[in-house]
């Protein structure tokens, strides 16, 4: 390098102007997610948010998540419009199972080379997820890191904070023998199991964009955004004595339901109470995946499982269906000291 050479940040692969253009693109949609508790706008060093005044003893609940390798599939298929919904869903659904109302959300978007159109599409999806869950998108970080990611590949992470009344925290401690388990239908594989999904696609040699499943491309089934249950579940909690809620994510039935069960209880799942959506049948057949592995990896059509008193089950199902969910009795709780916390029969 001679004395006359003058390097810029852009020469190193970081385009500040592109980052500024992205902020300008997303300001409008971010503003739509604003809640009355939010103070200030985008661009500050930190986001300020007051607690809603209706809470007497507010407890903050936080969560963070990503979308796993579903993102790789979305990048391969050049479909970025719903991955942001997935990101929000994975965070806010984890909050609401504890009874928490999501307050605000932040995102982290990292890439090797910032493509403003792609990033704007992703963040539009994040804003849509925030609108669906009543959560304010208060800020984020866009990191252009040449040498860390290949080309325009990117990764996303989400961070959410919610609030719940201390006396109304749902922690599973009230789960008891005889409780009914109510299922909420999923919209597809949601955001879990996609390393196996991609392996099945590779081994089977199919093209997800041209392979038809129930009259639409397989890709549409696989990239269907994760369902956000927040508003329906909050309405349910306000009307029914909910004992526990499990969000069926990584680990499927076997790993997630036990997380909300107290000692000496067992969940009995009636496998005949629902039919798997066709995408799960396709995955099992194309990948020759065992039944046990399916329930361990995928939600198999069940996004959440709710435990509540048997006397309130019908009321709960009617309320949830009225809110647009597909809910049904999927099983019950029984007293047991068995090490097997979940039985699917």
Curated annotation (Swiss-Prot):
MF (Gene Ontology): ATP binding; phosphoribosylamine-glycine ligase activity; phosphoribosylformylglycinamidine cyclo-ligase activity
Identification of the protein by name: Phosphoribosylformylglycinamidine cyclo-ligase
Domain of life per record: Bacteria
Reaction catalysis annotation: 2-formamido-N(1)-(5-O-phospho-beta-D-ribosyl)acetamidine + ATP = 5-amino-1-(5-phospho-beta-D-ribosyl)imidazole + ADP + phosphate + H(+)
HAMAP family: AIRS
Similarity comment: Belongs to the AIR synthase family.
InterPro entries in alphabetical order: PurM-like_C_dom, PurM-like_C_sf, PurM-like_N, PurM-like_N_sf, PurM_cligase
Species: Klebsiella pneumoniae (strain 342)
GO cellular component, one term: cytosol
Annotated compartments: Cytoplasm
Documented EC number(s): 6.3.3.1
Any Pfam family: AIRS
GO BP term, example: 'de novo' IMP biosynthetic process
Disulfide-bond pairs as recorded: none
């Amino acid at each position: 390098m001679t004395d006359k050479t003058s390097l810029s940040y852009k020469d190193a692969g970081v385009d500040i102007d592109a980052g500024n253009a992205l902020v300008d693109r997303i300001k409008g949609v971010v503003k739509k997610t604003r809640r009355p508790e939010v103070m200030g706008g985008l661009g500050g060093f930190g986001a300020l948010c007051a607690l809603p005044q209706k809470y007497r003893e507010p407890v903050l609940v936080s969560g963070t998540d990503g979308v796993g390798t579903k993102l790789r599939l979305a990048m391969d298929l050049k479909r970025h419009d719903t991955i942001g919904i997935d990101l929000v869903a994975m965070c806010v659904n984890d909050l609401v199972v504890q009874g928490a109302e999501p307050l605000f959300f932040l995102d982290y978007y990292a890439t090797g080379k910032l493509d403003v159109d792609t990033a704007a599409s992703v963040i539009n999806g994040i804003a849509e997820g925030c609108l669906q869950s009543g959560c304010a998108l208060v800020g984020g970080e866009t990191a252009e890191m040449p040498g860390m990611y290949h080309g325009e590949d990117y990764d996303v992470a989400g961070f959410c904070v919610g609030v719940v009344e201390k006396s109304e925290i749902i922690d599973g401690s009230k789960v008891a023998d005889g409780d009914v388990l109510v299922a909420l239908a999923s919209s597809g594989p949601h955001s879990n199991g996609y390393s196996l999904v991609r392996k099945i696609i590779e081994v089977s040699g199919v093209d997800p964009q041209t392979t038809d499943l129930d009259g639409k491309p397989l890709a549409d089934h696989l990239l269907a955004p994760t369902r956000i249950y927040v508003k329906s579940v909050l309405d349910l909690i306000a009307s029914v004595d909910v004992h526990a809620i499990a969000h069926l994510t990584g680990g499927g039935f076997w790993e997630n339901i036990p997380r909300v069960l107290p000692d000496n209880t067992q969940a009995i799942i009636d496998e005949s109470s629902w039919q798997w959506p066709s995408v799960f049948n396709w995955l099992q057949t194309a990948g020759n995946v065992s039944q046990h592995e399916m329930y361990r990896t995928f939600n198999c059509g069940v996004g959440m499982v709710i435990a509540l008193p048997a006397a309130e089950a019908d009321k709960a199902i009617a309320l949830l269906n009225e809110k647009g969910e597909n809910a049904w009795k999927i099983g019950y709780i029984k007293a047991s000291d068995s090490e097997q916390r979940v039985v699917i029969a």
